[in-house]
Curated annotation (Swiss-Prot):
Annotated Pfam families: HSP70
Region (Disordered) residue spans: 614-640
Name of protein: Chaperone protein DnaK
Induction: By stress conditions e.g. heat shock.
């Protein structure tokens, strides 16, 4: 049975792990790194680059290099958070026909799950290369505060990448799994997981208990902000640099996409450097030019300056911590361990703020980049039956309910309810002889339904005529272990029923997902074709170079017609190398090999002659000593 891999699909970086021989193995990618940038670039020749290769060319291809797409997944174009990103991203964010936020590259509209699927495909391939077998199943992590639409969209991304998503689990929960199974501490412990990643922030309060030799992980509460992370920290630095440069040079870099991409790279680098040093220098020659000539950017940033720029962002993480503690029904002093997850938690100011709130130093023995993928791999081994000593009880992060008379949100399932769960409630009609009811489903904490996230709606029709308040409509909410919602409505009088799995009320339709799966398969073939063509070109190029070199050395030993034939074959191969397909190049390679046969024979004959001459010279050079005497000896036997 093939293994279920664990994937941390991050905003900035992704990571893949697997349980191997009872141990979690974080798998290195083709570039030798344990994490992969969640960046996808679409090239003009149709090739798709993922990870470090995509990141390397971002400066020269900013409009077609997509990063931080996780911030858009499962979101509406009109959402405030999306509108804010439109002005900041060098690539285009566009409105899809269904109202979702999509991106555009090479003149084509692309759904965020498609972009995420490209990253997931790279993680799948990384795992397959390590395991030496095909991988078809995965556990994928999401921020704990992701709503239903965002979870569905992540599941869709997995399907497009050719993976059956066995479970969607929350990132802080996964980190707690990795921490809890790695440590030998006995007894019950309450831990806080503070997860500040590239695009999202989560905090979860989790109880780890030993129950009859089994480790039980129970999430008591979760809270967060799905639009707060390292990308926002980078943006503060970029805005500061743009402001300083404008003051100094009078040039506004915010409209120059090429400059912005270089600034993005420099800001991220500066932020990382300032976690270990007090000062860093941003040096970007030829950042732009005006009538007076090229302009260079040179700016020193201190750690204190960075902390001042991002202080408000760090402060924004504390309120969710407060709410999570309150919802869990615990005191801060009852928290035994604080675990930091996500690259941003390496920033000293973040660690300081966490210590200030929780009153204790956070643990330093958890790898913030790898813990989430490790936990996902552990959950994968639980689902495949390899591990039986772990029980995971997660929660739904936000309340779920329906809109009732007066636009009120009637909550069916409260936030932080352990999942899977099921809840039913009976409602009735608002008007006399009402033939149908519309069930509108919402997710959120506001009292008025319109203030919450609309997840979808459906009708229950064929209600027999009756005075208002008389028909009995039973509405049932059912959340599965992935945190995905199924809703049904039943007329108790007639037994008529209608049910839906809540798809994001836009989201991707089944047809669209199938089309994207087929596109992905076709792309895999196209990628294979491009790679094969590149290899053929390289080999042909090497042959041209080697033949030319040999022709220079041995050409005079050939007949004029033989030499001309080789030169003609080289020219034909070079012509076809520019834009020919694999078959055309192969044919010309064959022709050059045939034409070069005589040249090969001459080279071989020359080498043989040279070796013979060398051997002869060596034999002649051996010294002859006339005073050598043959030894004469006789065996003497001793008495025993």
């Amino acid at each position: 049975m093939s293994k279920i891999i664990g994937i941390d699909l991050g905003t900035t970086n992704s990571c893949v792990a697997v349980m191997d021989g009872g141990q979690v193995k974080i798998i290195e990618n083709a570039e030798g790194a344990r994490t992969t940038p969640s960046i996808v670039a679409y090239m003009d020749d149709g090739e798709t680059l993922v990870g470090a290769p995509a990141k390397r060319q971002a400066v020269t291809n900013p409009k077609n290099t997509l990063y931080a797409v996780k911030r858009l997944i499962g979101r509406k174009f009109d959402e405030k958070a999306v509108q804010k990103d439109i002005d900041l991203m060098p690539y285009s964010i566009v409105k899809a026909d269904n109202g979702d936020a999509w991106v555009e590259a090479r003149g084509k509209k692309i759904a965020p799950p498609q972009v995420s699927a490209d990253v997931l495909r790279k993680m799948k391939k990384t795992a397959e290369d390590y395991l030496g077998e095909e991988v078809t199943e995965a556990v994928i992590t999401v921020p704990a505060y992701f709503n239903d639409s965002q979870r569905q969209a992540t599941k869709d991304a997995g399907r497009i990448a050719g993976l059956e998503v066995k479970r969607i689990i929350n990132e802080p929960t996964a980190a707690a799994l990795a921490f809890g199974l790695d440590k030998s501490e006995k007894g019950d412990r309450k831990i806080a997981v503070y997860d500040l990643g590239g695009g999202t922030f989560d905090v979860s309060i989790i109880e780890i208990a030993d129950v009859d030799g089994e480790k039980q992980f129970e999430v008591l509460s979760t809270n967060g902000d799905t639009f707060l992370g390292g990308e926002d920290f980078d943006q503060r630095i970029i805005d500061y640099i743009i402001g300083e440069f404008k003051k100094e040079q009078g040039v506004d870099l915010s409209k120059d996409v090429l400059a912005l991409q270089r600034l993005k790279e420099a800001a991220e680098k500066a932020k990382i450097e300032l976690s270990s040093s007090q000062q860093t220098e941003i040096n970007l020659p030829y950042i732009t030019a005006d009538a007076s000539g090229p302009k260079h950017l040179n700016l020193k940033i201190t750690r204190a300056k960075l902390e001042a720029l991002v202080e408000e962002l760090i402060e924004r993480t504390i309120d969710p911590c407060r709410v999570a503690i309150k919802d869990a029904g615990v005191k801060v002093s009852e928290i035994d361990d604080v675990i930091l997850v996500g690259g941003m938690t390496r920033m000293p100011k973040v660690q300081e703020k966490v210590k200030e709130f929780f009153g204790k130093d956070p643990r330093k023995d958890v790898n913030p980049d790898e813990a989430v993928a490790a936990g996902a791999a552990i959950q994968g081994s639980v689902l495949s039956g390899d591990r039986k000593d772990v029980l995971l009880l997660d929660v739904t992060p936000l309340s779920l309910g329906i809109e009732t008379l007066g636009g009120v949100m009637t909550k069916m399932i409260q936030k932080n309810t352990t999942i899977p769960t099921r809840f039913s409630q009976t409602f009735s009609t608002a008007d006399d002889n009402q033939p149908a009811v519309t069930i509108k489903v919402f997710q959120g904490e506001r009292e008025i339904a319109a203030g919450n996230k609309s997840l979808g709606e459906f009708n229950l029709e064929g209600i027999p005529p009756a005075p208002r308040g008389l028909p009995q409509i039973e509405v049932t909410f059912d959340i599965d272990a992935n945190g995905i919602l199924h809703v049904s409505a039943k007329d108790k009088g007639t037994g008529k029923e209608n049910k839906i799995t809540i798809k994001a009320n836009s989201g991707l339709s089944e047809d669209e997902i199938q089309r994207m799966v087929k596109d992905a398969e076709a792309n895999a073939e196209e990628d294979h074709r491009i790679a094969e063509l590149a290899q053929t070109r390289n080999q042909a190029d090497a042959l041209v170079h080697a033949t030319r070199k040999s022709l220079t050395e041995y050409g005079e030993k050939l007949e004029a017609s033989e030499k001309e034939a080789i030169e003609g074959a080289i020219k034909e191969l070079e012509d076809v190398l520019k834009d020919g397909d694999k078959a055309a190049i192969d044919a010309k390679v064959e022709a050059l090999s045939t034409a070069s046969q005589k040249l090969g024979e001459k080279m071989y004959a020359d080498m043989q002659a040279a070796q013979a001459a060398q051997q002869q010279a060596a034999d002649e050079a051996k010294p002859v000593d006339e005073n050598v005497v043959d030894a004469d000896f006789k065996e003497v036997k001793r008495d025993q």
